[in-house]
């Protein structure tokens, strides 16, 4: 049995995603296709434009059989943490045979070579990165120059690593090595606009450009499948979107005005005096843009700052985050499936080394049931299972506060049933 896995955000699902999915299926010829998808918050440290159930529906209507949620504690990390959580989810299901990712270079041998070097020489490479960071460089630039020195190669070769999808590709392969997984990896050449292209540019426009167009009320119909367009239209009409970081500007500023430095000392990622920068900035800034720009320094990227905003709001304690980055995801949360996907889930429940959660209300019962099966070699920690799950619930409850329509802002989104699509 061949099972294709793709790591996605679908924020929102657009023509480029459909091209990637069709190409991946053509390459692998799978019996089932699953997507592991960011929930209500995405890797760049921003809320998704519509909620995770709406985006799961987009995926199911366009060829995905099962959508699983990447736990929030991984979805809001840098490329390495994001990949470790995403690949871990697929690996622990025990059935995924192939992963396909998009890449600007599409040079799988180069990506594999870099991944292997970084995996096998992580301590030496980390030392070089720290040395570059001390020069005041941002992490991406420090990583680039450290790699150039480590490989003793020219900067033009290393420039490939400035592409976001190539960086993620390297981290996916590294994660496969870390888990000692048998998952095969493949690459597809990315088509159309760059990942972070701000403006609409032809049929294959970036998700960033599409979100910007939505913000400025431009027509996006030609850049997304019809099903995506209709789902977005329905969510917007009901006041459940579009959701942007600015929607919760006052909430974010008040959160950091209420905090003291000691509140941030135990939060994952708050090092190098960032705790003071956040507190000071909250007190002198009048809006979110000012807040982020006042924190920004040469070595801190905007994405890192945005992620840290939510690390603090969701209370991502260092010890639990480090534990998470050692053990990987502790459960597989199902957001939706097709009737074909239901067949896959029946197989997965027999092979998975982590609990599969289709109904969050039954989380504790599911835990008791899996622990009764002592013959299976389980790969999760009960304390971490509960902690990661609680962060997903909290993230959803905060996310609904971003909704334009106040009547839609109730908590408890996660306790709905998963989406089931016929066919």
Curated annotation (Swiss-Prot):
Catalyzed reactions per annotation: cytidine(34) in elongator tRNA(Met) + acetate + ATP = N(4)-acetylcytidine(34) in elongator tRNA(Met) + AMP + diphosphate
Enzyme class: ligase
Superkingdom, natural source: Bacteria
The protein's name: tRNA(Met) cytidine acetate ligase
Keywords attached to this entry: ATP-binding, Cytoplasm, Ligase, Nucleotide-binding, RNA-binding, tRNA processing, tRNA-binding
Residues engaged in binding ATP: 7-20, 102, 165, 190
Main location: cytoplasm
InterPro entries the UniProt entry points to: Rossmann-like_a/b/a_fold, tRNA(Met)_cyd_acetate_ligase
Compartment(s): Cytoplasm
EC number per UniProt: 6.3.4.-
Gene Ontology annotations of biological process type: tRNA modification
GO molecular function terms listed in the Swiss-Prot or TrEMBL record: ATP binding; ligase activity, forming carbon-nitrogen bonds; tRNA binding
Function of the molecule: Catalyzes the formation of N(4)-acetylcytidine (ac(4)C) at the wobble position of elongator tRNA(Met), using acetate and ATP as substrates. First activates an acetate ion to form acetyladenylate (Ac-AMP) and then transfers the acetyl group to tRNA to form ac(4)C34.
Entry's family note: Belongs to the TmcAL family.
GO cellular component, one term: cytoplasm
């Amino acid at each position: 049995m061949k099972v294709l896995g793709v790591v996605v955000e679908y924020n929102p699902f657009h023509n480029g995603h459909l091209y990637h999915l069709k190409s991946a299926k053509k390459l692998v010829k799978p019996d089932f296709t699953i997507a592991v998808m960011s929930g209500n918050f995405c890797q760049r440290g921003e809320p998704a434009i519509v909620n995770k159930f709406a985006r799961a529906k987009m995926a199911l209507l366009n060829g995905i059989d099962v959508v699983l949620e990447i736990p929030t504690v991984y979805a809001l990390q840098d490329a390495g943490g994001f990949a470790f959580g995403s690949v871990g989810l697929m690996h622990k299901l025990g059935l995924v045979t192939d992963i396909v990712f998009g890449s600007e270079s599409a040079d799988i041998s180069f990506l594999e070579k870099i991944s292997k070097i970084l995996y096998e020489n992580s301590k030496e490479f980390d030392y070089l990165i720290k040395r570059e960071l001390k020069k005041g460089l941002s992490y991406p630039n420090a990583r680039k120059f450290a790699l150039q020195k480590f490989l003793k190669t020219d900067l033009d070769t290393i420039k490939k690593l400035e592409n976001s999808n190539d960086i993620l590709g390297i981290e996916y392969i590294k994660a496969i090595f870390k888990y000692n997984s048998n998952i095969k990896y493949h690459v597809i050449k990315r088509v159309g606009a760059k990942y972070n292209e701000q403006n609409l540019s032809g049929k294959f426009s970036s998700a960033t450009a599409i979100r910007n167009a939505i913000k400025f009320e431009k027509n996006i119909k030609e850049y997304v499948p019809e099903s995506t367009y209709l789902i977005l239209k329905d969510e917007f009409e009901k006041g459940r979107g579009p959701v942007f970081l600015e929607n919760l500007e006052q909430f974010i500023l008040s959160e950091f005005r209420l905090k003291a430095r000691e509140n941030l000392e135990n939060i994952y990622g708050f090092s190098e005096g960032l705790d003071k920068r956040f507190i000071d900035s909250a007190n002198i800034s009048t809006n979110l843009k000012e807040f982020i720009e006042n924190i920004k320094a040469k070595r801190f990227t905007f994405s890192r700052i945005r992620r840290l905003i939510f690390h603090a709001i969701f209370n991502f304690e260092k010890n639990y985050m480090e534990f998470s980055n050692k053990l990987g995801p502790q459960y597989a949360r199902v957001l939706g499936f097709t009737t074909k996907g239901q067949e896959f889930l029946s197989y997965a429940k027999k092979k998975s080394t982590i609990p599969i959660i289709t109904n969050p209300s039954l989380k504790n019962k599911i835990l008791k049931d899996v622990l009764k099966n002592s013959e299976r070699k389980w790969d999760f920690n009960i304390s971490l299972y509960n902690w990661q799950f609680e962060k997903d619930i909290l993230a959803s409850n905060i996310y609904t506060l971003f909704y334009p329509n106040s009547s839609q802002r109730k908590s408890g989104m996660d306790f709905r049933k998963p989406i089931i699509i016929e066919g």
